[in-house]
C-alpha cells in the first residue's frame, strides 16, 4: 500500500484528498482513473506525456485507465489560462484530430487496460433541458472564483456564456464515467474539483484528484505548445526528437528528466552527483534523449539517433577550428536569424531567412525550416550555414 501511494505521488504536484485515496486503495479493486484530452490539435507532444506516464504507472499498479477524448468539449474550447475567448473548432476538425490521438496514446498506455471514451456519447443526448439542469448546479459567482475568469472579468474582457459550461461538462464527465481518480495539469485544478462537486451532487463518491506539473517547452519559459512552436511531438522523426532534446538548456534538462524519465530516483540522483563532480551534462542528455526516442520509436531507432549524433559532433565531422560564441538572448531565447547574423554566419537577418528557406541552415545537424524558431537561453548549439560555415553558439 505504502509503495503504491509513493509511486502515485512521485512527480505529482498535489493529491486531493490523500486519505480518501488510501481508503479507495484499501478496497483492493481496480480503480477507474480518468484523464481527458481535447483533440484541438492533431498530434500529442511530450507535454501530454507527463499525464500519460502517470496513467501508465496506475496501469502497472493494476488500475484501469479511462482515456477520455473530449470531442464535445473540443468544440467549446478549454478557456483555462486564456485571456480571450477561444474560437470553437468545427465537428469535422475535432473528429480528424481525434483519429491520431488513439494511435499515439498507445505508445505509452497498455491497450488492454485502457478504455477509450468520447464525451459526445452522453453530452449529445443530454439535450437542452439536461444542459440547463447541469448549469443550475453552480452559480456565476462560483465560476468567477476561477483565476482566469476573475482576471478577465476584472479587466472588463469578455467571457462568453459557453465558456462557463466547459468546467461543468468536464465535471459531468466524471459523473458519467464514475471516476475514482482524475488526473490533470496544475492549471486544471478548478475543473477537477468541479468533478468532485458534481459527483457529490449526483450521489456518487467524490473522485480524488492528482495534478501534474506543466512541462515547459524547449524555450524553457512557456508551457509546451504547438502554437508556440516550442514543442516536441511524439510522432516526430527519431533524429528530430533527439536533436530537439539535445538543444535544450542543461537546467531544463533536469526538469525534463524529472517529469519524463522512467529511470529510478536513485539513477537520476546518481547523474546529478556525477555532473556536480565534473561529468559533462551532455553525457546525461544523450542517455535521456536515447530513452525518450526509444520509448516512441524503438531501441534500434534510438541507437541510430545516438550514432548519427556522435558521427556529426564527436568524430571529427565538424571543423577543429570552429569558433565559439556567447550571445545574449531576448525574452528567454534568441531567434535563429538573429543568432546566425550575430555569430557572423550570414550578412543580415534577411540573408538568414533566405538561407533557411533554401534549406541551408542546420542546428545540431537538424535542418531549420521555421524562420521563427528560437534557441532557448542556456542552450549550446552548433549552427551551420551551407557546407563550410560553422559556429558553436551559447545563448546566455
UniProtKB/Swiss-Prot annotation:
SMART domains: S4
Keyword match Cytoplasm: yes
One GO term (biological process): tyrosyl-tRNA aminoacylation
Keyword Ribosomal protein: no
Keywords: Aminoacyl-tRNA synthetase, ATP-binding, Cytoplasm, Ligase, Nucleotide-binding, Protein biosynthesis, RNA-binding
Family under the similarity heading: Belongs to the class-I aminoacyl-tRNA synthetase family. TyrS type 2 subfamily.
Subunit structure, interactors included: Homodimer.
Annotated protein name in UniProt: Tyrosine--tRNA ligase
Organism: Thiobacillus denitrificans (strain ATCC 25259 / T1)
Taxonomic placement: Bacteria, Pseudomonadati, Pseudomonadota, Betaproteobacteria, Nitrosomonadales
Amino acid at each position: 500500500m505504502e509503495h503504491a501511494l509513493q509511486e502515485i505521488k512521485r512527480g505529482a504536484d498535489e493529491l486531493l484528498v490523500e486519505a480518501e485515496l488510501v481508503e479507495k486503495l484499501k478496497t483492493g479493486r481496480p480503480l477507474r482513473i480518468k484523464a481527458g484530452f481535447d483533440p484541438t490539435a492533431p498530434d500529442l507532444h511530450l507535454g501530454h506525456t507527463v499525464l500519460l506516464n502517470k496513467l501508465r504507472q496506475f496501469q502497472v499498479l493494476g488500475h484501469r485507465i479511462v482515456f477520455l477524448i473530449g470531442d464535445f468539449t473540443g468544440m467549446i474550447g478549454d478557456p483555462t489560462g486564456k485571456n480571450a475567448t477561444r474560437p470553437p473548432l468545427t465537428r469535422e476538425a475535432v473528429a480528424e484530430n481525434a483519429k491520431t490521438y488513439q494511435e499515439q496514446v498507445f505508445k505509452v498506455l497498455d491497450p488492454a487496460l485502457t478504455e477509450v471514451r468520447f464525451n459526445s456519447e452522453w453530452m449529445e443526448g443530454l439535450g437542452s433541458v439536461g444542459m440547463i439542469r447541469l448549469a443550475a448546479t453552480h452559480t456565476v459567482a462560483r465560476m468567477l472564483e476561477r483565476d482566469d475568469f476573475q482576471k478577465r472579468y476584472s479587466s472588463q474582457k469578455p467571457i462568453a456564456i459557453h465558456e462557463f459550461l466547459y468546467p461543468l461538462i468536464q465535471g459531468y464527465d466524471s459523473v458519467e464515467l464514475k471516476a475514482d481518480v482524475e488526473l490533470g495539469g496544475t492549471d486544471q485544478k478548478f475543473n477537477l474539483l468541479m468533478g468532485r462537486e458534481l459527483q457529490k451532487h449526483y450521489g456518487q463518491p467524490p473522485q480524488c484528484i492528482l495534478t501534474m506539473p506543466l512541462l515547459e517547452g524547449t524555450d524553457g519559459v512557456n508551457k509546451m505548445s504547438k502554437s508556440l512552436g516550442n514543442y516536441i511531438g511524439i510522432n516526430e522523426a527519431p533524429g528530430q526528437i533527439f536533436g530537439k532534446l539535445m538543444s535544450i538548456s542543461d537546467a531544463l534538462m533536469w526538469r525534463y528528466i524529472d517529469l519524463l524519465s522512467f529511470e529510478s530516483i536513485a539513477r537520476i540522483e546518481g547523474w546529478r552527483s556525477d555532473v556536480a563532480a565534473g561529468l559533462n551534462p551532455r553525457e546525461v542528455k544523450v542517455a535521456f534523449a536515447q530513452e525518450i526516442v526509444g520509448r516512441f520509436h524503438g531501441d534500434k531507432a534510438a541507437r541510430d539517433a545516438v550514432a548519427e549524433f556522435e558521427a556529426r559532433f564527436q568524430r571529427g565531422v565538424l571543423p577543429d577550428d570552429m569558433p565559439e560564441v556567447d550571445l545574449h538572448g531576448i525574452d528567454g531565447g534568441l531567434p535563429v536569424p538573429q543568432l546566425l547574423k550575430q555569430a557572423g554566419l550570414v550578412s543580415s537577418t534577411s540573408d538568414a531567412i533566405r538561407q533557411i528557406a533554401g534549406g541551408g541552415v542546420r542546428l545540431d545537424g537538424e535542418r531549420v525550416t521555421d524562420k521563427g524558431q528560437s534557441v532557448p537561453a542556456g542552450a549550446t548549439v552548433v549552427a551551420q550555414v551551407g557546407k563550410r560555415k560553422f559556429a558553436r553558439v551559447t545563448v546566455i
